[in-house]
Regions:
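Conserved pre-ATP/AMP-binding loop-to-beta segment of ANL
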Residues: 86-89, 102-124, 131, 154-160
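Conserved AMP-binding A3 loop
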Residues: 120-146
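Conserved AMP-binding loop of ANL adenylate-forming enzymes
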Residues: 14, 152-172
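Conserved AMP-binding/adenylate-forming
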Residues: 1-43
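Structural core segment of the AMP-binding/adenylate-forming
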Residues: 4-5, 31-97
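Conserved S/T- and glycine-rich ATP-binding loop of Class I adenylate-forming
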Residues: 12, 29, 60, 119, ...
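Short aromatic/basic micro-patch
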Residues: 61, 113, 136
Length: 172
């Protein structure tokens, strides 16, 4: 659906509390749509505005807490921002639309070719000593991290992991 919206190869932000829908949004972007830009949920509106502009985000998945600020930023025509996608209700609609596209024979997302050297994750440093900086990661960086950890840990379907860190700042 994101590809159908014209977001193939574009930068798409994700902001919100740690939750299942955050991960679904993240993976739907990074696994064949474009570049994911995880955003710090604790940023004040002016810093959020700055990151949206600097990263050239065209769409953002968000939770209800950020709706008012993001609508204001969208109305102000900040950067390239065009779409706001709520994790509260629109995500289910997007999934249904995606299923319809697949039934109609659209396999653009399923058959997406991923360039493992191309940047598809854009992180921002916390900016504790100065303005936050962009860290560009490729799909290869991501997969290498997973392969390394799986060679150390014996993970199976019975395992449970607890994360208390903000999800935008870590990959677990």
């Amino acid at each position: 659906v994101l590809i159908d919206m014209g977001l193939k190869g574009k930068r798409i932000g994700v902001i919100g509390e740690n939750r299942y829908e955050w991960e679904i949004a993240y993976l739907s972007i990074v696994c064949g749509t474009g570049t994911v830009v995880p955003l710090d949920k604790s940023l004040p509106e002016n810093e959020l505005r700055s990151l949206i502009e600097r990263s050239e985000i065209e769409a953002i998945f968000y939770t209800k807490k950020y709706e008012e600020s993001l609508k204001k930023i969208l109305e102000e025509k900040v950067g390239k921002l065009k779409y706001l996608i709520s994790m509260e209700n629109e995500e289910q609609e997007l999934i249904k639309k995606g299923e319809q596209l697949i039934k109609q024979g659209n396999r653009e997302f399923i058959d997406a070719k991923i360039d493992n050297e191309k940047m598809n994750i854009m992180l921002f440093t916390s900016g504790t000593t100065s303005a936050s900086k962009i860290v560009a990661l490729s799909h290869k960086n991501l997969v290498s991290n997973l392969m390394d950890i799986s060679s150390i840990l014996d993970v199976n379907s019975d395992d449970v992991f607890l994360s208390f860190l903000p999800i935008h700042h870590v990959f677990e």
